[in-house]
């Protein structure tokens, strides 16, 4: 099993993802974006951060790289793809997920724990959750307000909307591709996570799905 953790200039959540995978029983591989190639990995995670300093728009420059062409190719083959925070922004900019992430309303950077409801369990990342289950994860973003572009499928919704996101959406998916603004990799260890380990099931679900 090979799980790539894709790193762009400005990515800063990569080691948190590697740690989350380790706690869930797998070993991720940190992959510099120029070294990523389609057909080599069983899953890929786009970690959070500020790729290219959020120039132009959050995720816009990373979305235009050759690496994302390879990610798109893998996604079309059914490889599970996860984008967290800035990774979610990259996926929308690249057209792998519908809609866009725009500045928060009210504006400003938000960094706190939030309650998130699982509303769809039909993905490789959510199928171990119960539909309607509420978990806690931290958020840390200034451009996390989701706006749809036509039809979309929500996987997670905020219990108490922190950023003005349409219909309380915290994460959306399309087949095997999932993006979410909350950070499941920072909610995996009950000894250090302030509000429990609600993100751990996401990683356990991915690993279980890959082992089927």
From Swiss-Prot:
Gene Ontology molecular-function annotations: ATP binding; glutaminase activity; phosphoribosylformylglycinamidine synthase activity
Domain of life: Archaea
One Gene Ontology biological process: 'de novo' IMP biosynthetic process
Protein name: Phosphoribosylformylglycinamidine synthase subunit PurQ
Pfam family, one: GATase_5
Quaternary structure, from the entry: Part of the FGAM synthase complex composed of 1 PurL, 1 PurQ and 2 PurS subunits.
Organism: Pyrobaculum aerophilum (strain ATCC 51768 / DSM 7523 / JCM 9630 / CIP 104966 / NBRC 100827 / IM2)
Principal location listed in the UniProt entry: cytoplasm
SMART domains xrefs: GATase_5
């Amino acid at each position: 099993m090979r799980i790539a953790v894709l790193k762009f200039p400005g990515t800063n959540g990569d080691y948190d993802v590697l740690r989350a995978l380790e706690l869930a029983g797998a070993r991720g591989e940190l992959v510099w974006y120029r070294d990523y190639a389609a057909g080599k990995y069983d899953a890929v995670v786009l970690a959070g951060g500020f790729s290219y300093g959020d120039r132009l728009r959050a995720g816009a420059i990373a979305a235009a790289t050759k690496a994302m062409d390879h990610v798109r190719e893998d996604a079309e083959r059914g490889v599970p793809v996860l984008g967290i925070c800035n990774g979610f922004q990259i996926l929308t900019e690249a057209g792998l997920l519908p809609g866009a992430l725009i500045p928060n309303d009210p504006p400003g950077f938000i960094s706190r724990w939030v309650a998130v409801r699982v509303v769809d369990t039909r993905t490789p990342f959510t199928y171990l959750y119960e539909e309607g289950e509420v978990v806690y994860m931290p958020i840390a973003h200034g451009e996390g307000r989701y706006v749809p572009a036509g039809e979309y499928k929500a996987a997670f919704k905020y219990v108490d909307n922190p950023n003005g996101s349409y219909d309380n959406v915290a994460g959306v998916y399309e087949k095997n591709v999932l993006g979410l603004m909350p950070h499941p990799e920072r909610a995996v260890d009950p000894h250090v996570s302030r509000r429990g380990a609600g993100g751990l099931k996401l990683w356990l679900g991915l690993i279980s799905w890959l082992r089927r």
